[in-house]
Amino acid sequence: MPIITDFKAIATGLFVTWKHIFRRSVTVEYPEVKRTPAPRYRARIVLTRDPEGGERCVACYLCSAACPVDCISMEATEDGNGRRYARWFRINFSRCIFCGLCAEACPTLAIQMTPDYEICERDIMELVYEKEDLLIDGCGKDPAYNFYRHAGIGVTQPRGAGEREEEPVDARGLMP
């Protein structure tokens, strides 16, 4: 009876083949047809600007500290007004795992993730992006965000002298 079981196995295989031969193909012809990623898809990292056109990055090193694979490096410096900025900013995309922790850690929304997933190069050194490669002209996902307009500037006034700031509490005056 092995001939009958062999024939049954072949017939089952042919039936499955004929059943699937007229269905729509699941394969996407990638270079010609590009799939649209999900709305919250995280891929290429960019550095955004504030609404005035200046850099949002204040070189706080939080993104570098949050990165689990240590692919972000930078050097901080100050301009003439005392505002901190990154003299150079570098991301090694050959090491990046696109987890998004750097974008979550950034207090000024300078680092944002885009859905651009076509990052491939023949030379691995071309995957190391400098600040000039990462900076975009726009404000990113939240164009009205300008909360940290004065981030990185040292406080020159005494406590309680700023706008909408209350006088500090004298703890010794509260003691019995």
Swiss-Prot record:
Entry-linked InterPro entries: 4Fe4S_Fe-S-bd, 4Fe4S_Fe_S_CS, NADH_quinone_OxRdtase_chainI
One of the record's GO cellular component terms: plasma membrane
Gene3D superfamilies listed in its UniProt record: 3.30.70.3270
Pfam families assigned: Fer4_7
CC cofactor: [4Fe-4S] cluster
Domain 4Fe-4S ferredoxin-type residue range list: 45-77, 87-116
First-listed, main subcellular location of the protein, grouped into a coarse class: membrane
Record keyword Cell membrane present: yes
Top-level taxon: Bacteria
Annotated TM spans: none
Topology of the protein relative to the lipid bilayer: Peripheral membrane protein
Entry EC no(s): 7.1.1.-
Residues noted as binding [4Fe-4S] cluster 2 in the record, renumbered to the chain: C67, C96, C99, C102
UniProt subunit comment: NDH-1 is composed of 14 different subunits. Subunits NuoA, H, J, K, L, M, N constitute the membrane sector of the complex.
Family, similarity comment: Belongs to the complex I 23 kDa subunit family.
Protein name: NADH-quinone oxidoreductase subunit I 1
Species assigned in the record: Geobacter metallireducens (strain ATCC 53774 / DSM 7210 / GS-15)
Encoding gene (name): nuoI1
